Amino acid sequence: MEFSTQQTPFLSFNREQWAELRKSVPLKLTEQDLKPLLGFNEDLSLDEVSTIYLPLTRLINYYIDENLHRQTVLHRFLGRNNAKTPYIISIAGSVAVGKSTSARILQSLLSHWPTERKVDLITTDGFLYPLNKLKQDNLLQKKGFPVSYDTPKLIRFLADVKSGKSNVTAPIYSHLTYDIIPDKFDVVDKPDILILEGLNVLQTGNNKTDQTFVSDFVDFSIYVDAEEKLLKEWYIKRFLKFRESAFNDPNSYFKHYASLSKEEAIATASKIWDEINGLNLNQNILPTRERANLILKKGHNHQVELIKLRK
């Protein structure tokens, strides 16, 4: 098999080249298993899972085995058998690119691996500041930007998980109310693998050498990519679907959008993209792409067309 060997830190594969790397890994997901894993606006097929995610699962398992071997060597050197360290995978990318779907599919595939590893999934949405604080600090228009997250709290969470603590809690975010759910938590209890999904999980500081970042705790990082034109198109399409469903819920923070005409809804979604999501993409998210260990570049119909793997 041939792949790109240009002077770049990445190896590049098209779909066919990448699919060959699946080897004999069986697909244990069925169409019925796949449906609950899909995002609101995605129609991802089992073929996509076989072509893209099975080879990726195989690769990640090799990395995890190597990581466990390294831990064994360290324990032998130190003369003590410390608690097993969870392997942390981060998934970054823009709003509407399909990060959550990728995360759920990976969680399912890695959980069904013959080694029966325990795989937990947490999104960084739970570490957004509460809505009242964002309003108070005049940050509502910056929601999703790095400044809108309680990063120290997220760092403490990751440090506790990485150190092998039991029953580490993470806040839960509601997309319906657009806010943190009071007194509700996800519990992470010594997983073999933790998948962390969020917009800004690849970020580092600007020459701040004494600061700890989310990326410091990550063993393998994935960036889900697509051209901005497609991202905006997918965002508007998703907005229109929400207008006909979730926005009609009386508890929805966005219920005022339910009465918009289709033309008004498209204009509103386009404005939100240009002023918030697109801005965040170009200022904060896209600049972190090249730090990833793996880049999945999507084309039309949410299909991955190009895979870039760090050498």
Curated annotation (Swiss-Prot):
GO terms for cellular component: cytoplasm. Belongs to the prokaryotic pantothenate kinase family. This is Pantothenate kinase. HAMAP family: Pantothen_kinase_1. Its main location: cytoplasm. Pfam families: PRK (PF00485). GO terms for biological process: coenzyme A biosynthetic process. Pathway: Cofactor biosynthesis; coenzyme A biosynthesis; CoA from (R)-pantothenate: step 1/5. It is an enzyme of class 2 (transferase). It is found in: Cytoplasm. One of its GO terms (molecular function) is pantothenate kinase activity. Keywords: ATP-binding, Coenzyme A biosynthesis, Cytoplasm, Kinase, Nucleotide-binding, Transferase. Its EC number is 2.7.1.33. ATP binds at G93, S94, V95, A96, V97, G98, K99, S100. It catalyses: (R)-pantothenate + ATP = (R)-4'-phosphopantothenate + ADP + H(+).
